[in-house]
């Protein structure tokens, strides 16, 4: 009867399809306790040791850091990394990392000082006094990630679970051959693991907590049972040994009987899974206040003389760990990071240990066997029988090889856990997992490109829609403006139309002239006065510079006005007559001399004191001469062609003009002119008028006799002498 009740109390477990039973090879390393490894002289800490983006750097080259000090900031899925020991940051540069191709990733390189000093640690021994959010934030900021191999940020995983989680599963199966890191951790630190499990349960509040462990770990099972002897909140489930029972989906099915849907997660069925190493890291982060700076790593293989499990600081070079374990490499020695089924071969040994590194396998040549040649698939279906995910590996192989991405996706290649069971049983030695990894990478690249194209298309369509809206709005504005013009535009149009109509009305009105009456020119007079006023205003606004600088000379103004009137009359007469008469050289010479004298006088007056007082007598004489010249030009314009030029007279007049010019230049620099005598001025004006009349009479008399060049030259010389003598006599008289 007792045996019957014991059978009813036995916890039920389930099984999954497929799976294999490879040699375990765990006894090489699980028999010795955990031990510390001497500090390496230099540490390389990659910024990205988890799923997601790398954190933001918060240190610089040359900074001194302590163990546990944050090197990056963690926001969202960006998980921070911490210094594994105290030392100095000597570089922040790309460095080869734990990857099949040893890809270079940005890393912080620290030179250890050997002191291994910690930051100030603050633990929460009473973690129940803190809120769920505070605990999750602490776990995240202390860099805790999944240590079972995935490297998913634990804080993000706990935050995403929320209230949907009904079952918390602790994965202690550790099913892959050679790896004993979790086994040794459970043997040496069972109490700390259980305390970390209780912290996770406090955060999630599930209905049940299950620990799944394979039956090939008797020492670990006994230690956990001893710790859980009086506990009723955690159940320990021992499961049969079969690879890969440690897979998340496979262990969930074994312990709960539920299957995770295709393309889904275990949280979709109310299950959340954590590794025993992660539970231990949670305890150290929350209770002890220690960020994750080290983890347990299995050093095993026949090429290692002292296999076992060690506490390896993150960032320690693989070469340093293997040398500490007595590594004896052969000619073609390989080193595998991870297990023999899911691990990968390292191109060289300078890569650092990261959070997902659980094993370093250094097998001998006889241990792993010689590599065999890949052969063609014989469609034996052994791979399909061994697949724990119920897939068809042979079909996925053909799809991957033929680049048939759609068919590979339709056959759920994303559900492949890359356990390597298919490749283990394949008689043709086909590396199926390598094909599947490459195919999934290509599909991810295609999806990423499609996502970028969709985003670009969405941006383009949004831009086109915006341009169409702007165009429609612009057309609407133009249409409304055409239909309803603005008030000021209407006023301007109306005013313009009124002006046009007024001009048309004025043009069409007949001109009525009454006999015996004067025409009404008031409108014309008003328009002329308006134009004059406008001209005066414009002249006042823009005065002539020379007029503003020096005062006007009435005498010069009178002479220039008379000359201008004469020229105007002459031009009016010439406009309707025959072509202009020949130029009189004598007159041209006289006018040129007078112009030069005036120019010299004006230049001297511009730089000297203000102009001297105007002499009315000289002004009257020059005005009379100008009027006489004007009358003479008028008569010549309407009469016969000009008489022949008399060179003698021209020379005499030129000499007289030059003498007058010299006299004017001398008078410019002398004392102010003497007071003007009105009587003398009147006499000189009368004499000038008489001379002008005489010249007019001579103009209409007999034509001038032909000019004799010799006589003209003699007369010109006599005239020059007389002009000089007259100028000197004038100067003496004035003195």
Curated annotation (Swiss-Prot):
Cellular component per GO?
plasma membrane
Q: Does the keyword Transport apply?
A: yes
Q: Which cofactor does it need?
A: [4Fe-4S] cluster
Provide the protein's localization.
Cell inner membrane
The record's cofactor note says: Binds 2 [4Fe-4S] clusters per subunit.
For this chain, the annotated S-S bridges are none
Alphabetically, the GO molecular function entries are:
4 iron, 4 sulfur cluster binding; electron transfer activity; metal ion binding
What topology does it adopt in the membrane?
Answer: Peripheral membrane protein
Role according to the record: Part of a membrane-bound complex that couples electron transfer with translocation of ions across the membrane. Required to maintain the reduced state of SoxR.
Annotated PANTHER family:
ION-TRANSLOCATING OXIDOREDUCTASE COMPLEX SUBUNIT C
Instruction: Give the protein's recorded name.
Output: Ion-translocating oxidoreductase complex subunit C
Please report the organism this UniProt entry assigns to the protein. Answer: Salmonella agona (strain SL483)
Lineage of the organism: Bacteria, Pseudomonadati, Pseudomonadota, Gammaproteobacteria, Enterobacterales
Recorded name of the encoding gene: rsxC
